[in-house]
Amino acid sequence: MGKRLGLAESAKRTPIYVEIPIRATMERVWELSQNPELHPRWDLRFSRIIPTDQDANGQLRFRYEFLLPLHTIKGTGTSLGHRHRSDGQATSVLKFDTADVLSPIGAGAGYWRYVPTADGLRFITGYNYQPGMGFLGQALDARLIRPALGWATAISFDRLRLWAESDLEPQDSRNLWFLDAGARAIGMVGAASLLRRVFSQRTTTGAKAGMTALGMSVALATWALPTHSSVPRAGRCLRTAPDARSARAPSALADLKAPRQHDGEGGEAVATRAENQTAASITSEPAGKY
């Protein structure tokens, strides 16, 4: 049924899947996710997205940046969106690549689906990539990099949801997340301090029992206290596709042009290693369904 896109070495790597329900209009979510100035405000995976050109078929070429304290990872990408499909959905497909040896992500591809529901929509992404950073990236991808990217994608989706539903600016939800995390960290440090005193001080058995109970109670309350609804959480997202259709990339991904980069200093623009193969292992819809 579906067509698999990908390199042989990527076949064993599980694509990242994230889905969240959003109680907002399709137009609202489309604008917040497709506008290159708004997209990086909620998506932790990008610091800047700079469109460079668009062809006659609507395929958009862009550059992206991810700012680190001492380095900026740069890459290129192509994307194509379909706002109005015959089935009522909207979709967007993407291919990306980077020549940055410090990037943990190499060439890859993915998609977004906007699936209408009775009270809003399901916002879905699936993507896969070749690990970057050479042997180190290969070694760390499955256990560290890929789970971290999945978490970053999920918490970003919840930031988008809060923005679309409640007009809570992404920087404000980020600050609330840090406040929540800080408060929980203080609680755990306090609990650890109480438990440490139990073993470091000479006190009666009753006092030790009381301090132990207090320390354990503080730790449990800190861990179990529900997160406020305004604090973004990755746990509000699905991380496994509920059905086969959701996990399929739109068929337009197969025909999307690969991003192009400059081959060295002053070199000609050449197709990247993602040309005609995307480093993804994503099942796509049959042709003709976008």
Regions found by a protein language model. Name each.
Residues 1-61, 184-199, 213, 217-290:
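Hydrophobic ligand-binding cavity/cleft-lining segments
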Residues 6-10, 68-76, 83, 95-151, ...:
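Beta-strand/loop substructures that line and gate deep hydrophobic ligand-binding cavities in soluble
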Residues 15-16, 47-49, 63, 95-98, ...:
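Short structured motifs
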Residues 23-27, 53-57, 82-90, 113-122:
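A short, structured loop/turn motif at beta-sheet edges
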Residues 28-33, 39, 60-64, 94, ...:
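Hydrophobic pocket/interface hotspot
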Residues 55, 65-70:
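Surface-exposed, charged secondary-structure patches
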Residues 128-175, 182:
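A conserved amphipathic terminal alpha-helix motif
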Residues 197-209:
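Membrane-interfacial hairpin junctions
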